[in-house]
């Protein structure tokens, strides 16, 4: 295995030696989440300077149920000293009622680093290590979305603003390269092959206005469906929650349905279309856009799913103000406040991604579990690749 034409062992040795020179005899705090990026960054630093590293999990309240305890146990099994710092109430109180995606991400970033700054001071540390990788700063500097862990690349000087020096040993690597390092370092498979999880956690999957009830519903259905979601042949699969969308139509939508009928050979009526209230992130050219998402319902769901790629090719030419399209895979029920969207993608580098086919029985099993939560009224499967969509919604 090679990274940048270097033997992986040589590459790791160079990283470790570089970390030793930078850190010297100073103390280091490592921000860890249980993801492969932050774990590899923390573990490399531990290999370099040993117990001068203190690893912290910041409990923002946006992790999945039971995740923090599991992550702490796994990291400790590797030899790391791990502490959990609970600031969930602070994050909830600061974010309640906020609906703009960029505002939510920026509030999260500010609170996150203010918290870390206090911990760095308490631990008498000079450095903060984090697992920023290339797609994080590429998407942020390119204006696609603000990643919470990008500072220096956008002109923020952490030593002046927060009082610590930042170390990002993986900042020029991509996800597949980080996984190569993790495998060589014998990091537990549960971490190594863990699906990516955004730094702000479930906050960015509570799309639109943040409400505690919305978060509770998302946490609940995520627990119900976690094992089923892992059965999808995907690099990443997850659920996001939205306000119940409204029925809609327009000349462009009518034109799209005509095109869908041509693609599928369906005649007659039976289609319903829904517009989501929330704007979602998409990509046009090299720029980010916040645009609309359309939901399509037809009683023969399997028929629509079978031609999803053709629908995706057709819709951007017809619907100029939409960057995403999703197929309703449940029967709508009148009760309930929220809709759930299933998102699954296949990718090697997370810069582009396709949407996998999902067995209809598996999809129905996921729907059945989601609909056990009476707060949910509809379930959709997002069929939009990256681009024109991003993987996450905010």
Where is each model-derived feature located?
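ATP/NTP-dependent adenylation/nucleotidyl-transfer catalytic domains that generate, transfer
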Residues: 1-394
């Amino acid at each position: 295995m090679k990274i940048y034409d270097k033997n992986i062992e040589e590459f790791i040795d160079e990283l470790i030696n570089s970390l030793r020179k930078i850190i010297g005899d100073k103390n280091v705090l490592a921000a860890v989440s249980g993801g492969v990026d932050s774990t590899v960054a923390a573990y490399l630093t531990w290999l370099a300077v040993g117990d001068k590293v203190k690893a912290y999990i910041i409990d923002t309240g946006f992790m999945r149920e039971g995740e923090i305890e599991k992550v702490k146990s796994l990291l400790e099994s590797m030899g790391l000293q791990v502490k959990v710092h609970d600031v969930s109430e602070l994050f909830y109180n600061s974010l309640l009622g906020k609906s703009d995606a960029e505002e939510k991400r920026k509030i999260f970033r500010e609170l996150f680093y203010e918290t870390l700054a206090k911990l760095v001071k308490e631990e008498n540390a000079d450095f903060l290590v984090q697992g920023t990788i290339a797609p994080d700063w590429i998407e942020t500097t390119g204006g696609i979305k603000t990643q919470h862990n990008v500072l220096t690349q956008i002109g923020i000087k952490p030593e002046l603003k927060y009082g610590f020096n930042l170390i990002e040993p993986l900042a020029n690597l991509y996800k597949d390269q980080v996984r190569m390092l993790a495998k060589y370092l014998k990091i537990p498979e549960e971490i190594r092959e863990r699906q990516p999880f955004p730094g702000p956690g479930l906050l960015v999957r509570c799309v639109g206005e943040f409400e505690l009830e919305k978060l509770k519903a998302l946490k609940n259905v995520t627990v119900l469906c976690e094992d089923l979601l892992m059965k999808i042949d995907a690099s990443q699969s997850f659920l996001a929650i939205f306000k119940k969308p409204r029925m809609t139509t327009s000349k462009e939508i009518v034109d799209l349905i005509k095109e869908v009928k041509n693609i599928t050979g369906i005649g007659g009526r039976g289609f319903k279309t829904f517009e989501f209230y929330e704007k979602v992130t998409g990509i046009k050219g090299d720029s980010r856009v916040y645009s609309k998402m359309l939901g399509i319902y037809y009683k023969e769901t399997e028929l629509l799913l079978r031609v999803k790629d053709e629908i995706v090719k057709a819709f951007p030419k017809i619907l100029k103000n939409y960057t995403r399209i999703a197929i309703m895979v449940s029967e709508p029920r009148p009760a309930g406040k929220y809709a759930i969207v299933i998102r699954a993608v296949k990718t090697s580098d997370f810069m582009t991604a396709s949407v996998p086919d999902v067995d209809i029985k598996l999809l129905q099993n996921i729907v059945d579990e989601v609909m056990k939560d009476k707060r949910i009224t509809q379930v959709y499967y997002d069929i939009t690749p990256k681009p024109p969509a991003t993987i996450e919604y905010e």
